[in-house]
C-alpha cells in the first residue's frame, strides 16, 4: 500500500505531542499563562491527532486488503478486499493533502479578535461615502459569521465618514479579516455626476489583531489619559459628560481613543485594547523591518494604483488584484458575502506555503 511515509512520521510526532500536552495541562492548574499557551497549541494538535487516527485507520484497512488479495482464495473475500483497497487508494491521497494543509505554519494571531480602522484616501466625497459602504459590508459579514462588532469611533463628515474604527470578536476573526488590510478602490458614477462619468476613488483599511495584557505589557506611569465630550451619535450621554477617552503612550506617542461607549469606563477599556494592538504592531515593525515594509506596501498611501481590490459598480464586478480573481456579483459581496474572495486568498496563501513544505 503506497503512502507518504515522511508525512506519516511527521503527523505521528504531532499526535505524540498532543498526548504530552494533555498530560502537561493537568500539572499546571494554577499557571494561567501556561494554561493559555498549552490550550492554543492543543487547538491545533488535537485536530491533527484526530485526523491522523482516521488516516491510520484508512491506511490499515488498505494494507489489510492487500494482504487478503495476496493470500486469500475465497472469491467473495477477494471482491470485498478489492473494494476496500480501491477506496483506500482514492481517499488516502486526499487525506494526505488535508494533513499537509494542517501542518502548514499558521499566523499566531489567527485566533484573535481584530481592530479595524477605515479612512478615505483619494477621490474626495466618493471616498468618504465608500468608507460607510464598506463598513456596512463588514458589519453584515460579521453577522453572517456570528461575530460580534463593537464600534469604537465614527467621525462623520458632510457626505460620509472621515474615520471609522471598530472591533470584531469571535472565532478565528483575524485569520479571515487580515486579508482586508490595504487600499480598496471603487469605480462608480456619483449621485452628483450629471454626465454619467465614472469616478475612481480609494479608501484604506487597516486590520490589527487584538492583543492580550500578557502579550503587551504597558507601564501605567507611561500613559496620559484625557477625557472629553463625545461628538456625533452615541445616545443621550453625548455632549453632557466627558465620557470619551483618549490614551497616549508617552514613550512612543501612540494614541488610541474611544467615544462610542455608554460610559467613561467602557471607553477607557476599549481604548486600552486599541492601544495594546497599536503598540504590538509598532513592536513588530521595530523587530522585523521586512514585516514593516510588507505592511507599508500593503496599506500604502491610498493612491489609486496601490489597490488590493476594485469594486466596479457599473459592471457589478469585484476584482481582487492579489490573486487576479474577478466576480460579477458586487451587489452580493457588498451585502457581506465575502467568503468566496477570502477563501480564495487563503487557498492561494496555502499553495505558497505548501511549496516550501518538505514532506
Curated annotation (Swiss-Prot):
Compartments where found: Cytoplasm
Gene3D superfamilies: 3.30.160.20, 3.30.70.1660, 6.10.140.1950
Entry-annotated residues carrying N5-methylglutamine: 236
Gene Ontology MF: a single term: translation release factor activity, codon specific
Principal place of residence: cytoplasm
Keywords, ordered alphabetically: Cytoplasm, Methylation, Protein biosynthesis
PTM field: Methylated by PrmC. Methylation increases the termination efficiency of RF1.
Alphabetized PROSITE patterns for the sequence: RF_PROK_I
Gene Ontology CC annotation, any one: cytoplasm
PANTHER family: LD18447P
NCBIfam families named among the record's database cross-references: prfA, PRK00591.1
Family membership noted in the UniProt record: Belongs to the prokaryotic/mitochondrial release factor family.
Known role: Peptide chain release factor 1 directs the termination of translation in response to the peptide chain termination codons UAG and UAA.
HAMAP family named among the record's database cross-references: Rel_fac_1 (MF_00093)
Official protein name in the record: Peptide chain release factor 1
UniProt source species: Ureaplasma parvum serovar 3 (strain ATCC 700970)
Amino acid at each position: 500500500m503506497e503512502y507518504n511515509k515522511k508525512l506519516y512520521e511527521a503527523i505521528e510526532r504531532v499526535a505524540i505531542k498532543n498526548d504530552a500536552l494533555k498530560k502537561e495541562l493537568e500539572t499546571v492548574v494554577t499557571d494561567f499563562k501556561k494554561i493559555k499557551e498549552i490550550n492554543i497549541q492543543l487547538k491545533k494538535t488535537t485536530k491533527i491527532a484526530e485526523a491522523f487516527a482516521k488516516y491510520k485507520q484508512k491506511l490499515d484497512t488498505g494494507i489489510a486488503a492487500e494482504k487478503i488479495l495476496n493470500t486469500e482464495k475465497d472469491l467473495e473475500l477477494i471482491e470485498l478486499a478489492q473494494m476496500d483497497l480501491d477506496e483506500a487508494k482514492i481517499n488516502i491521497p486526499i487525506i494526505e493533502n488535508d494533513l499537509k494543509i494542517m501542518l502548514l505554519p499558521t499566523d499566531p494571531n489567527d485566533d484573535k479578535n481584530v481592530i479595524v480602522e477605515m479612512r478615505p484616501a483619494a477621490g474626495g466625497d466618493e471616498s468618504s461615502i465608500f468608507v460607510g459602504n464598506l463598513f456596512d459590508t463588514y458589519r453584515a459579514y460579521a453577522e453572517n459569521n456570528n461575530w460580534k462588532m463593537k464600534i469604537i469611533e465614527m467621525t462623520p463628515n458632510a457626505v460620509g465618514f472621515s474615520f471609522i474604527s471598530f472591533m470584531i470578536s469571535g472565532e478565528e476573526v483575524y485569520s479571515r479579516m487580515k486579508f482586508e488590510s490595504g487600499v480598496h478602490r471603487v469605480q462608480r458614477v456619483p449621485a452628483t455626476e450629471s454626465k454619467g462619468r465614472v469616478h475612481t476613488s480609494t479608501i484604506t483599511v487597516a486590520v490589527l489583531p487584538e492583543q492580550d495584557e500578557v502579550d503587551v505589557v504597558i507601564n501605567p506611569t507611561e500613559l496620559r489619559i484625557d477625557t472629553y465630550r463625545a461628538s456625533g451619535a452615541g445616545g443621550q450621554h453625548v455632549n453632557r459628560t466627558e465620557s470619551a477617552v483618549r490614551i497616549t503612550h508617552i514613550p512612543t506617542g501612540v494614541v488610541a481613543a474611544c467615544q462610542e461607549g455608554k460610559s467613561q469606563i467602557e471607553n477607557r477599556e476599549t481604548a486600552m485594547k486599541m492601544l495594546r494592538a497599536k503598540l504590538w504592531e509598532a513592536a513588530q515593525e521595530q523587530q522585523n523591518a521586512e514585516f514593516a515594509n510588507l505592511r507599508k506596501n500593503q496599506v500604502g498611501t491610498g493612491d489609486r494604483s496601490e489597490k488590493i481590490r476594485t469594486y466596479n459598480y457599473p459592471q457589478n464586478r469585484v476584482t481582487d488584484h492579489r490573486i487576479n480573481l474577478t466576480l460579477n456579483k458586487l451587489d452580493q459581496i457588498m451585502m457581506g458575502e465575502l467568503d468566496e474572495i477570502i477563501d480564495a486568498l487563503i487557498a492561494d496563501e496555502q499553495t505558497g506555503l505548501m511549496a516550501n513544505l518538505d514532506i
